Each structure stands twice: as C-alpha cells, then as structure tokens.
C-alpha cells in the first residue's frame, strides 16, 4: 500500500515528506523534485514570498544514485526564512524576554474569515492563531508536491502515464471550454502567466487579477487535471471507498482552499438527459472506442481507458489585503482580521498541487492493481494484464475488421 505524509510548519525549519510503499527501481532525482516545486511557484498574482522563496531539496532516504530502493523515501525542503523565525518557531523553550522583543511573536487573536484560525483556536485550545495558521498554510503543499514527484515518475516509467493541468477560469474571467490539452501542450501551459491553454482566456484572467489587486482583494478559480495513458480497470466498483472517484475527490478536497471537485462533465451532466450524458461505445480496430468523454475517464469507480479529467474549484484566498470583519477572541470586541503576507491569486499553482494529489492516488491504485517489489516486476504484471484485456476485446476488433468499421 502506497502511503504518504507531510510534516512541518510554514515558517518552521523545514517541510518533510515521507512516501512509503514505492517500488524499487524508479528513477528520481532531487532536481526532478525541485523542478516540480518551481512549477508550484508559477502564476500571475503571486505574493512577495514567491520572489525569494527557494525550495532547497534534500532526499534523506529511500533513493540511491537517483533510483528508489523500495524503502520509505524522506524528502526535506528547507525554509530560506528560517533565521528570521528561529526563536518564534523554535521546538525547544525560548527565553520569554527574547520573544517579547520579537514583532513576529505578537499574539494573533483576530481570526480570518474563511481560514482555519477560528475553529483551530477553539478546537485545540490556543490563545493565538499562530499554531493554526502555520500548519494550515498552503506552504504545506510544497511537501505534497515533493511526494507527488515520486508518484509522477512511477506512473510515467511503469505505465507510460502523464499527468498535467491547466486553469479553466479565474474569478469571473472568460472560461476555457475547448478540448483538454495533451502532454505536448504542457510547456505552452507552464509558459502562460496564468497556466492557461488559450491566449484570449489568458488575457481575461490577467485582467481579473489586475482588477482584484487594485481593489485590495483576492480571487479563486477552477483548474483541471488531465491524465493520459491510463489502463482500464484501476479502482473498483465493489465498495464505496474502493471507487477511484471517491479517492480522487477526497485527495483533491484535502488541498487548502479547494471547495469543490467534479470528474468529467460533473455537474453539467445533472442538467442533461441520459441520452446526452454518457459515452456511447463503438467497435474499433483495437477494441471498444468512444467519440465523447463526458464521464472523464471513470465509470463505476474504475478507469475506462479514456483520459481522466478532474476539475477543482478554489475559493478566493482568505487573507484579504483590505481585511474582513471579525472578532478579537482576546477582548470579545469586533475587529478587523489579521493580515499575513499573501497572494492575490494562487489558482495557477493550485493546478500543480491538484496534479500532485491525482498522481499519488493513481500511483496507489496502480500498485494495488499490479503490485510488485520492483519497477520491472510492476511492468511485467501490467503487460500480462494488458494482454488479457486485449484477448477479452478481440471479438470487438475482429468484428470491426470483418465489417470494415473504423477502416
């Protein structure tokens, strides 16, 4: 069973990701991880922190000479600002006089609407929001991206699967309604200021961000992850928690600020009749073919061989520059919410994080289906399964050949 966990605080010494259950033989380097972390920093509308934040990556265990060993993989991501926060975020007790002189240690008692501050303070008995916001911060997603790089490399090397994403809309901008991009389009997408796949939509998104920045406000949006090359049969229909769509939705909803997930055409299918909501099947030279992908590559909780499409809705960042009304929990008085340095819009970066969680879930599903202790063994198991699937679809291909369909 593939498992992953992260540790660390936003202004702590470092973030740590641990991946357990990955097979031996997967090629991965600290450079590959750093490249994915750099993609996470992309996007128009990011805050000042992105200008100096550099994700120094150290692989602590589980990889030797660029190849996984089969044991737990631990990855550390340094915090370049740690010297400024060393006393405030120290693990061991610090002299009270030293903390009193630090503006960074000022009590944060005015929780931000939409953030974890309020519920976290009450749940854990904190008098200060600092312990909450440090762990709840989206900075934690850097550790997830590091873990997801391992999964991404496994999917590519074992199954030939590629995971990418693009931004559908930002705020009230124009919405991208064209066909999903292919793996050859990723360079173009990452070169876009907002990771958009359409120049006109990109201009509309940038205008939205500029307007929000001028007004001292923040923006959310919608991103789509696309996965290419998946085999039929990952996931299961046998129980709810084995359904791949339930696992994907849970993983993506676990990303900070994500408030909605849909697979394929999702909510749009609720407005259609059944005759226009599903993907009809036809005979093709290689087996069953389809002309549409409304289901987004999943049927009955299982992959069906078509591209997987997962969309996520990100709410506007809750640290609003012009600040929202709140209550000071120390005095009970009405107040203005605390304001930490933040982005106007982090939707482009959210797409990379959605890719990460989708890759982790799919890698877990693939390992559950095909198993193996090494990359080579997983490949052999996959090849045997694919031969069995081809045999099962042979009558379809034979009929297609005899009838001249798809020629």
Swiss-Prot record:
Gene3D superfamilies: Chorismate synthase AroC. CDD domains: Chorismate_synthase. SUPFAM superfamilies: Chorismate synthase, AroC (SSF103263). The keyword Flavoprotein applies. Reduced FMN (FMNH(2)). Keywords: Amino-acid biosynthesis, Aromatic amino acid biosynthesis, FAD, Flavoprotein, FMN, Lyase, NADP. This reaction introduces a second double bond into the aromatic ring system. This is Chorismate synthase. It comes from Mycobacterium leprae (strain TN). The gene is aroC.
């Amino acid at each position: 069973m593939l498992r992953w966990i992260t540790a660390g605080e936003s202004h702590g010494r470092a973030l740590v990701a641990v991946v357990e259950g990955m097979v031996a033989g997967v090629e991965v380097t600290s450079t590959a991880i750093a490249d994915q972390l750099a993609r996470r920093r992309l996007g128009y509308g990011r805050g000042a922190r992105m200008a100096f934040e550099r994700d120094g990556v150290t692989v602590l265990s589980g990889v030797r000479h660029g190849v996984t060993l089969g044991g737990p993989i631990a990855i550390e991501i340094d915090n370049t600002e740690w010297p400024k926060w060393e006393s405030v975020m120290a693990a061991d007790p610090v002299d009270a006089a030293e903390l009193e002189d630090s503006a960074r240690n000022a009590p944060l008692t005015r929780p931000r609407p939409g953030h974890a501050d309020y519920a976290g303070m009450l749940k854990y008995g904190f008098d200060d929001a600092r312990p909450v916001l440090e762990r709840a911060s989206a900075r934690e997603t850097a550790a997830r991206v590091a873990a997801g790089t391992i999964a991404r490399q496994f999917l590519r090397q074992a199954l030939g699967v590629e995971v990418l994403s693009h931004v559908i809309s930002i705020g009230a901008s124009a919405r991208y309604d064209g066909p999903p991009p292919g793996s050859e389009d990723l360079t173009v997408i990452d070169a876009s200021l907002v990771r958009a796949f359409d120049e006109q939509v990109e201009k509309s998104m940038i205008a939205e961000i500029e307007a929000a920045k001028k007004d001292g406000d923040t923006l959310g949006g919608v991103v789509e992850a696309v996965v290419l090359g998946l085999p039929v049969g990952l996931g299961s229909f046998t129980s709810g928690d084995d359904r791949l769509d339930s696992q994907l939705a849970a993983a993506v909803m676990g990303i900070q600020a994500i408030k909605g997930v849909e697979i394929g055409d999702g909510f749009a299918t609720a407005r259609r009749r059944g005759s226009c909501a599903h993907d009809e099947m036809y005979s093709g030279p290689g087996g069953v073919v389809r002309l549409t992908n409304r289901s987004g590559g999943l049927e009955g909780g299982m992959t069906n061989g078509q591209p997987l499409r997962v969309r996520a809705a990100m709410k506007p960042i809750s640290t609003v520059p012009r600040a929202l009304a709140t209550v000071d929990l120390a005095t009970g008085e009405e107040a203005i919410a605390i304001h930490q340095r933040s982005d106007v819009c982090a939707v482009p970066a959210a797409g990379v994080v959605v890719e990460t969680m989708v890759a982790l879930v799919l890698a877990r599903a693939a390992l559950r289906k095909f198993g193996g202790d090494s990359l080579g063994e997983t490949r052999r198991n996959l090849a045997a399964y694919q031969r069995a699937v081809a045999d099962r679809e042979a009558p379809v291909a034979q009929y297609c050949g005899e009838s001249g369909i798809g020629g």
